[in-house]
Amino acid sequence: MFLKSLFGKSKEKSLTLGKLSKIIGAELPRAVDGSALCRTVLTQPEYVAPGDVVISAGWYDHRRVVSQSLEKGAIAVFCPAGKKAALFQDDDRVIAVENALECVKRYELWRENGCKAKRIAISGSVGKTTTTGLIGSVMAGCFRTLTHHPMANSHGAILRNIQKLTPAHEWWVQEVG
């Protein structure tokens, strides 16, 4: 029960590729099946499983992110239009967007809609993970608390965690930076 309250359950929001593209402001090519279900939205290929969607936001090399994501079974990868044209022109699974970072932001805002959890963000140069874990453990004893992903010190961690946030959570403790 402790781990369930500490990490929470995924918020059940059925998401198709077509709906995701509208949320993030992207236009799907005609050849892409907009009714395909999106399992998880990520920014890093290391976490991709079949059915996931990736937004290559520019934190990592686009060629590597797109290629590895597709190899691992991502149904689509959104990336900057210039990179799509230069590197992946012939692959319909790679979808051009004007501003990939803005796409991540729009998705996160949509994802947290309806969730009223208060947030505690832990930053600094030393002790973030320990402090986040300690505060999360203490908070989980009294409140429905979501705490950070085990590999939270990366750009994609907040995106991975926000997909676990539910309206039932009262607090969200997140390591940042």
Residue ranges and their predicted role:
Residues 1-104:
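N-terminal leader/targeting and accessory segments in enzymes
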Residues 103-177:
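Phosphate-binding loop of NTP-binding sites
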